Curated annotation (Swiss-Prot), chains A, B:
CDD domains: ALDH_F18-19_ProA-GPR
The organism's taxonomic lineage, starting at the top: Bacteria, Pseudomonadati, Pseudomonadota, Gammaproteobacteria, Moraxellales
NCBIfam families referenced in this protein's UniProt entry, alphabetically: PRK00197.1, proA
Protein name in the entry: Gamma-glutamyl phosphate reductase
Similarity-based family: Belongs to the gamma-glutamyl phosphate reductase family.
Role this protein plays: Catalyzes the NADPH-dependent reduction of L-glutamate 5-phosphate into L-glutamate 5-semialdehyde and phosphate. The product spontaneously undergoes cyclization to form 1-pyrroline-5-carboxylate.
Catalytic activity: L-glutamate 5-semialdehyde + phosphate + NADP(+) = L-glutamyl 5-phosphate + NADPH + H(+)
GO cellular component, one term: cytoplasm
GO biological process terms, semicolon-separated: L-proline biosynthetic process
Matches recorded under InterPro entries: Ald_DH/histidinol_DH, Ald_DH_C, Ald_DH_N, Aldehyde_DH_dom, G-glutamylP_reductase_CS, Glu-5-SA_DH, GPR_dom
EC number annotated for this UniProt entry: 1.2.1.41
Keyword rRNA-binding: no
Keywords annotated in UniProt: Amino-acid biosynthesis, Cytoplasm, NADP, Oxidoreductase, Proline biosynthesis
Localisation per UniProt entry: Cytoplasm
């Protein structure tokens, strides 16, 4: 079995590599044609796709998947419409491939510039949500990359049905069918193969729980664009405008709980804590947010607030729970963020110019915000179109990753016969 | 021993991480001050450094190091001057850190942009040449990164002497001495530690032979900016201007042999081969370049030309040897380059507009050149100032890597109290 999985994955890899060569020089027109044909095929195949999803859902219920997972797995007609809209958005995006920038003459007489090119073959590993299949496939196609998709086994029928529509679209546009491949085995060995086929795969994008991503990062022999966790902070400075601070602190925590850009720890300057904390606590109480505070927070808000432990500062709750710490000054806030945070998204609320500059320069996170809710850190809000993930790495892509994160730049040189002396 | 190496390296890593936090927000003025102080210290320490190098050289001769290695190891007064000039060049470079680009308003009212930041801690692994110690240290410092340097054991005394001058310079400028650390053990286990300390090191830059780099890439748990090999091509199209083609083909092969951007295979369009090959062969003969040709090449040039085997197409000779293949058309040339090449640097010589566009779009190499010698692919010629390496990867940095390759961009958001709806 192990052998046959290896053979299967090697074949998938070879086909992807071959298809990627065609895709890399496909015109914008051809790629958009394929995406439009996929759109039409999806509309035509909607009943089959929803039926396949119903099979996955029934199997999921039979095997007692937890309700959050079942929720993510489900494709309703509304979600299906959302998927189609996402696809339309990708068609509307500017094709990044072939863009030439920075063309300038060097003293030798050569003219040097950079040209944007696809990475090649993307390996995508994800859990449950079948809409990721379409999102990832369309972003890969638009950016001239081939993609190998490995969704969760619980979504296999849904993903296969979506893949059928995608294949149909590729065929209509005359692009190789292996440009987008869905792994059709539930065997976990397939993932082990995918993340080590260095000759066939150029980058791995995992999406899912922290344990999945950690496992993949540890075992991959291929660069991984990974998103570990989002332990985000908002720091309310003594010079904060409370008309901004209160809505931001409320929005960053309560707009949605289960998302990576939600605030998990609130930091408050000690000279504003007496005024700010009781007012924000009242707003959190209305939303039933559980507060866990440092000693000073509990002195101000009362001992009904639980004590935050060292562990709390590290925790991404993804729930209506918030840790609160009173700090002496901005340096302590920055130190806390850089030490306990996950380098995802952190914000300061202040009117002070020099503190803005300090916070921007010293907070080591993929998004650093001034007087705005951390909830803005996402591909749509950043105008990237669809988002293939949010990277907490520093190498290659950082923060929300859209089309450009799936590309690279090569150097180009225009000469007139120059030789090196 | 293994334990103590681990403890030693962990301490080195922790200190580097700590120093990197200071460096990341050091001003351009402070960093340049430190570099100038290092310059002065090097000038003052020249006798000690050359004496230390003499010790390494003697030891090298005693242990029968080969002459190429001894040559790379040697620090002559002329080479020392070259090192100092390189340092001056780095001081003159624009500081990339803190650069803010693409600031634009989003529909939500937030203003979004990107800010250039250091990667953090660089691990540099290299062989013999002690000037790399200064080059890498100065580039890291200028770009706000801490660096851990692990040179070859044969250069240990030279590297320690250079490091002493560097430490002195850091001290004068008030920067942490651990910003630049030289590993002082010859134990190979130190490398194993360095490339797996994911919490303390952000990127590994290996420089050396292919086997060293392959070993490091395979074992590293940290992203590697690697340069495997340079199997470069020049394709002489039927529409080539021979006044350009002859000098380029000669220069790309014979300007220097032991460099990664030298041409290793010459591809010639069949309709120009009869005219071009005898003329270029004459020029190569003057330089005593050994030719290995395909069947058609040997038909034209005579059977004194050796037969090129499949193996030859893959080979980076780094020597006065050249493989030659006659191809039917540009597609065959591109296919050959993408299949056998190392995606380093490849050139076409042609006057045809559409072939230029095709070659640029379809050749998958870090540098793609039109009517210019492949020898131009280097950090100095590209105006990057010093070069920390040439990357044959697509992720993060591609081609010659200078200061910018040691940086990353974070997103920054300026708001006025915006929350997400």
């Amino acid at each position: 079995m192990q052998d046959s999985i290896e053979q299967y994955m090697q074949a998938v890899g070879q086909q992807a590599r071959k298809a990627s060569r065609v895709l890399s020089s496909a015109s914008t027109h051809t790629k958009n044609n394929a995406l439009s044909a996929i759109y039409t095929a999806l509309v035509n195949h909607e009943p089959e796709i929803l039926a396949a999803n119903a099979v996955d859902m029934q199997k999921g219920r039979d095997s007692h998947l937890d309700s959050a997972l079942l929720d993510r797995l489900e494709l309703t007609p509304t979600r299906f419409k959302g998927m189609l809209q996402g696809l339309k958005d990708v068609i509307a995006l500017t094709d990044p491939i072939g863009e030439i920038t920075d063309l300038a003459y060097r003293p030798s007489g050569i003219q040097l510039g950079k040209m944007r090119v696809p990475l090649g073959v993307i390996g995508m590993i994800y859990e449950s949500r079948p809409n990721v299949t379409l999102e990832a496939a369309s972003l890969a196609l638009k950016s001239g990359n081939a993609i190998i998709l490995r969704g969760g086994s619980e979504a296999l029928q849904s993903n296969k049905a979506i893949a059928t529509a995608i294949q149909h679209g590729l065929k209509v546009a005359g692009l190789p069918e292996h440009a987008i491949q869905v792994i059709e085995t539930a065997d976990r060995a397939a993932v082990g193969q995918l993340i080590t086929m260095t000759e066939y795969v150029d980058v791995i994008v995992p999406r899912g729980g922290k344990s999945l991503i950690e496992r993949i990062s540890n075992e991959a022999r291929i660069p991984v664009i990974k998103h570990l966790d989002g332990n985000c902070h908002v720091f309310i400075d003594v010079e904060a405008d409370l008309h901004k601070a209160l809505p931001i602190a409320l929005n960053a925590k309560t707009h949605r709980y289960g998302v990576c850009n939600a605030m998990e720890t609130l930091l408050v300057h000690e000279e504003i804590a007496e005024e700010f904390l009781p007012r924000i606590a009242e707003l959190y109480a209305e939303k039933h947010v559980e507060l866990r505070g440092c000693q000073e927070t509990r002195r101000i808000l009362g001992s009904s607030v639980k004590t935050a432990t060292e562990e709390d500062w590290y925790t991404e709750y993804l729930a209506p729970i918030l840790a609160i710490k009173v700090v002496e000054h901005i340096d302590q806030a920055i130190e806390h963020i850089n030490k306990y945070g996950s380098h995802h998204t952190d914000a300061i609320v202040t009117e002070n110019y020099s503190k803005v500059r300090k916070f921007l320069a010293e907070v080591d996170s993929s998004s650093v915000m001034i007087n705005a809710s951390t909830r803005f850190a996402d591909g749509f809000e950043y105008g990237l179109g669809a988002e293939i993930g949010i990277s907490t790495d520093k190498i290659h892509a950082r923060g929300p990753v859209g089309l450009e994160g799936l590309t690279s730049q090569k150097w180009i040189v225009f000469g007139d016969g120059q030789i090196r002396h």
